Amino acid sequence: MLYPEYPEYDNFNESGALIKVVGVGGGGGNAVNHMVMNMVKQEMGGTFVGESSLTSEEHGRIVFYAVNTDAQALRKSQVQQTVQIGGETTKGLGAGANPNIGRKAAEDDQDEIRKMLEGADMVFIAAGMGGGTGTGAAPVVAKIAKELGILTVAVVTKPFTFEGKKRMQFAELGIKDLSQYVDSMIIIPNQQIQKVLPKNAKLIDAFAAANDVLRNSVMGISDMITSPGLINVDFADVRTVMSVQGQAMIGFGSAVGEPGAGRAEEAARLAVRNDLLEKIDLSNAQGILVNITAGMDLVFEEFNIIGETIGSFASEEATVVVGTSLVPEMSDEIRVTIVATGLGEIAGNEPIQVVRQGLSTQNIEGEGRVNIVPELHRRESVEVSRTASEEYQRPLDKPITDRLEAFKKNNFFNPAQREEN
């Protein structure tokens, strides 16, 4: 029997795969800042390259970067490694909600971006879509990562509906542009935040919860490939699954209770199911990565139930990888992390998948709850007039309809034509 051929991967050094997390623009930068601060406070994750004492050799390496046209935002960033782009075009004042300027800024500093990405085995690109730098520059960063052969996952947001149709249109076009270069993309609509959090939730808490999605996504995959387990998941497994292009989903479920079918079913249900995701078809997932983390009391029945639950929505040709980590300190708890990829082509008018996380501390007989939060809020740059060139000049009072025409003129909507010009 001949088995299908898979690409060969180099052996990784003992310190583990190098993961780089790049926040592009205001929203992406905020998400990465949030992750850095939480890692410092909780001392979780791998070898944190930055101003921290996180040096656990049991985890892989994670390096953080902030990329922005806004010099002030970079100065305030908690991320030690920053890359300012488009200094000549923007004078350090931001892209003014103009993706064309964000794109040109990144293209002007491609060499710096390339240096930033070199050496990485996997890159997460975080960005808010619909504004200037995130929408315009993130595809350029992803394209360079692709040229370097780096496994690349984008975690992006779409605007609130009250921000207008034009901003949403820019976001959808930016997502379409970005999708050409990433291996997988996780898209979260900011509008979901009002459906998840209580009405009296504080704004700062809402955005903090939203930014946890990037942190959980990065740490979930990092823990999969770096934590020793009874059944290990290595980076080659992650690459095989995440390389299935299209929409992706990362889910987290946790349940507490006596070992047995009850808590396993609960954790798996929380990881794969939520009413807010009913428009998303998981039945055709082409790649599935599962990691089960539990104490020494994990029983075979639980392992089998979780596997069957996950397998129920996989396509017949799907690549399914299941890993298991036993943590002696965990008592009565089981956690399930799921990565599903190849869920369909990414298009602006397609239903959007949501990254979700679940936690159940109820007795198994009771109903658990699913906690789903949208990810990344954006930090608006101050709108300013551009004087670097007539092509990218945008006065403060220029109507958005005129800006849309300018986008079309400069082939923002057609990446292929942009490359030919």
Curated annotation (Swiss-Prot):
Entries under CDD domains matching the protein: FtsZ_type1
One Gene Ontology term of the molecular function aspect: GTPase activity
Subcellular localization, as worded in the UniProt entry: Cytoplasm
Keywords: Cell cycle, Cell division, Cytoplasm, GTP-binding, Nucleotide-binding, Septation
Main subcellular location of this protein, as a coarse class: cytoplasm
Cellular component, GO annotation: cell division site; cytoplasm
Short name of one Pfam family: Tubulin
Gene3D superfamilies assigned: Tubulin/FtsZ, GTPase domain (3.40.50.1440)
Positions contributing to GTP binding: 26-30, 132-134, 163, 167, 211
A GO BP entry: cell division
Transmembrane parts of this sequence: none
Family (UniProt): Belongs to the FtsZ family.
NCBIfam families for the chain: ftsZ
Protein's job: Essential cell division protein that forms a contractile ring structure (Z ring) at the future cell division site. The regulation of the ring assembly controls the timing and the location of cell division. One of the functions of the FtsZ ring is to recruit other cell division proteins to the septum to produce a new cell wall between the dividing cells. Binds GTP and shows GTPase activity.
Oligomer status and interactors: Homodimer. Polymerizes to form a dynamic ring structure in a strictly GTP-dependent manner. Interacts directly with several other division proteins.
Protein name: Cell division protein FtsZ
Lineage: Bacteria, Pseudomonadati, Pseudomonadota, Gammaproteobacteria, Pasteurellales
